[in-house]
Swiss-Prot record:
It holds the Pfam family DAHP_synth_2. GO terms for biological process: amino acid biosynthetic process; aromatic amino acid family biosynthetic process; chorismate biosynthetic process. Belongs to the class-II DAHP synthase family. It is an enzyme of class 2 (transferase). This is Phospho-2-dehydro-3-deoxyheptonate aldolase 2, chloroplastic. It comes from Solanum tuberosum (Potato). It catalyses: D-erythrose 4-phosphate + phosphoenolpyruvate + H2O = 7-phospho-2-dehydro-3-deoxy-D-arabino-heptonate + phosphate. Its main location: plastid. The keyword Transferase applies.
Amino acid sequence: MALSNTLSLSSSKSLVQSHLLHNPLPQPRFSLFPTTQHGRRHPISAVHAAEPSKTAVKQGKWSLDSWKTKKALQLPEYPDEKELESVLKTLEMNPPLVFAGEARSLEEKLGEAALGKAFLLQGGDCAESFKEFNANNIRDTFRILLQMSVVLMFGGQVPVIKVGRMAGQFAKPRSDPLEEINGVKLPSYKGDNINGDTFDEKSRIPDPHRLIRAYMQSAATLNLLRAFATGGYAAMQRVTEWNLDFVENCEQGDRYQELAHRVDEALGFMAAAGLTVDHPIMSTTDFWTSHECLLLPYEQALTREDSTSGLFYDCSAHMVWVGERTRQLDGAHVEFLRGVANPLGIKVSQKMDPNELIKLIDILNPANKPGRITVIVRMGAENMRVKLSHLVRAVRGAGQIVTWVCDPMHGNTIKAPCGLKTRAFDSILAEVRAFFDVHEQEGSHPGGIHLEMTGQNVTECIGGSRTVTYDDLGSRYHTHCDPRLNASQSLELSFIVAERLRRRRMSTQRL
């Protein structure tokens, strides 16, 4: 397919370059073994991560269980401690779910995002469940993340780092330890790896054997994701065809048609240059997993010492984050996380004091290593415009390197007239726009977006071009916790973000 103008040719070339950068040929995708490097090491930078250096510990000696000396919030109370210990010993003997080299590779990519040279797309279920576990659901979420990543990559002309809230995102913090229905109070549902969502006394008792089931489900999910990422399902041509189909069947498809067809033209150029669908660059992709580091006994049981660096990695996921409710400076969760070498996320709301954020980053990343810390901001559009700039200035003033990411979901949860929790697409979009506006104002880099979403055609968030109304919520409301964007809403959001990335890129090029 011939390209008709210089802009298309330039975009095509940039897409090739960014795809090559994101998928270097010599390194196998989703390697089952730690990544090894040969020759002279690169110095630490946001682009090239050096050989991992041991984390400096300022608050006493760290150990795998030093978190037990701190106050631990949001942890369940198991009725039989001996049974819990038996389960944890079994997990300690099981193979790791991910490897240190994979986590280091992700950290290097996130370091690029901190400098505006890459963009993080992190998404998946609010909470994975045993009941909804099947290959089709995993495939559909992976597919929509692929579609979104291609759109974002073309808009920003930078690599897109794909990280799923998958293969371990079970446990959920709760604001109230008890749930009341019709005058009956029971312990709150905390996620399928802790207790059951059925409202009866037996289901709500924490069961340690659920940890084994969660581990097995995570392993199966990872196995399928690896197959999808390397087996041809992620082929660029296939993903582009899916996006073109979305545009043709979308009520507001005209808004996105130009970008979708430019991507298609770029693929024509790449094919003419020899990058056909059979080329590994065009048929495989990198993909990482993440979840909230909440259930510390489980995380400790899956932490392993890396033989190549001597560092400890939480091998339950490539990336883990500390939540808004568990990020206390002197708390157990921060104590555990400061000693593992994975890239870490920090969830931040409007309640975060700038000085507290600086202290927290210093505890978790005293060496100021690029890619180590991702600050995931969740506060609603109005608070974003008022509060985020203070956080950005404080972190920059302290000389700290972080990747700024927008979570437009958690600050926009409302209750519908029918009683179900929902989120409005327009509110989500408003927070994303506020995030970009603040970074444009501050001269900092918007490093990514973090979404609760699914590849299913659910009706949990209202709005979007294929409008979901309050009346529609009950028809396909399947979430076990918070409302998620459906496939159409997720892809629509990615087109809007891609256009914002394109505008940012064009304005930067003119400077």
